[in-house]
Amino acid sequence: MSTAALVEGKIVQCIGAVIDVEFPRDSMPKIYDALILDGSELTLEVQQQLGDGVVRTICLGASDGLRRGLTVKNTAKPISVPVGKPTLGRIMDVLGRPIDEAGPIESEHTRSIHQKAPAFDELSPSTELLETGIKVIDLICPFAKGGKVGLFGGAGVGKTVNMMELINNIAKEHGGYSVFAGVGERTREGNDFYHEMKDSNVLDKVALVYGQMNEPPGNRLRVALTGLTMAEHFRDEGLDVLFFVDNIYRFTLAGTEVSALLGRMPSAVGYQPTLAEEMGKLQERITSTKKGSITSVQAVYVPADDLTDPSPATTFGHLDATVVLSRDIASLGIYPAVDPLDSTSRQIDPNVIGEEHYTITRRVQQTLQRYKELRDIIAILGMDELSPEDKLSVARARKIQRFLSQPFHVAEVFTGSPGKYVPLKETIRGFKMIVDGECDHLPEQAFYMVGTIDEAFEKAKKIQ
């Protein structure tokens, strides 16, 4: 469409990131239309029609220097971003513009960031397991190919490091394309992630979309949709794609900010009244169809470690597997700090993962649960008051707890020990030996920060 044909309007009010624009009454923009400020690249997205030709928009960029009376043009279509192979290896912003100073993105195709979720009869369920090489995840909450996974945790328990390790293990082994959406996280993490991908030579298979903490709420709200749109395009071309979001909570938070600016009444804990709908719109699109699959891993910040907060609670219902990171476990120095009793997966079913894996997982959880129940007694009366069976349970539980830790490739700088990738068979064999009592003679330190059970035996020899 030529710029001459664009309908023009005038700014009539600016309140922070919310801009009201007046258009001729017979040519008002539609909801979600993108408007462009004349003479600049600043984009506004229509959120409400107030009547009398006035629309209320949210600004996707800094609103510094805006004033009443400036001319705005209506593009008469929603925000569209480049999709396809030219986006791989590039860093883009919410509007799909490159921010890596490596020239323009030469993409033939663009796609609107607002898409309908696939119809129910187009969906394709999957039960094929996705091996991550992380013992605690493969054993307790295995991932499905084409499934949705959430990493839940408070501040500083290791969501981003866990996600980086998953990307490192899956993206390298997987060989397909990945899309990473950095939603309202630290720019430092975005930079680290870029270099991590570059150093491991998988950058040419990853599209990076960033709307970081320092950006206006409009950008943070829409950047998840931008990344998802790119992932959907690869899926619709018949590919299996990985979609990583860090952090889905910031998406909700940006929605809360926008909602308040638009003058909506807040609901529980001050969140937007449309929380469930906004989350549903995003999550229903992250799905696998008969054409291709999207396997998504989402980090979910848990405010004040409260899993019943409306934001994480709304996210729970959409996921196939939940990995809960616990501050108590992190404080023991056990990393990844995954809580084996709180984390769950829909794949934990003997018909899906097999009888042996299912039995071992349940036995490990029973042992840990028994230890949890006995902890108060031990704190008051000491170990001597326990029955011989309980003493054995506690000893095994402590070994299991330590064996659930693992050195990560992406954390080699901090730990000083090389990262370990543990195949699922080895994970099952190791935990089977512990619960069967074949490792009762080994000291519990031998199980800390090792890969396979054989390494624990080697470490025990050095200790003794």
UniProtKB/Swiss-Prot annotation:
Gene symbol of the encoding locus: atpD
Primary localization: membrane
Location of this chain's protein in the cell: Cell inner membrane
A single GO cellular-component term on record: proton-transporting ATP synthase complex
Statement: the UniProt record of this protein carries the keyword Membrane: yes
NCBIfam families given in the database record: atpD
Binding annotation for ATP: G153, G154, A155, G156, V157, G158, K159, T160
Keywords: ATP synthesis, ATP-binding, Cell inner membrane, Cell membrane, CF(1), Hydrogen ion transport, Ion transport, Membrane, Nucleotide-binding, Translocase, Transport
Catalytic activity: ATP + H2O + 4 H(+)(in) = ADP + phosphate + 5 H(+)(out)
The protein, known as: ATP synthase subunit beta
Keyword flag Transport: yes
Oligomer status and interactors: F-type ATPases have 2 components, CF(1) - the catalytic core - and CF(0) - the membrane proton channel. CF(1) has five subunits: alpha(3), beta(3), gamma(1), delta(1), epsilon(1). CF(0) has three main subunits: a(1), b(2) and c(9-12). The alpha and beta chains form an alternating ring which encloses part of the gamma chain. CF(1) is attached to CF(0) by a central stalk formed by the gamma and epsilon chains, while a peripheral stalk is formed by the delta and b chains.
UniProt membrane topology term: Peripheral membrane protein
Pfam families in the cross-refs: ATP-synt_ab (PF00006), ATP-synt_ab_N (PF02874), ATP-synt_VA_C (PF22919)
Its EC number(s): 7.1.2.2
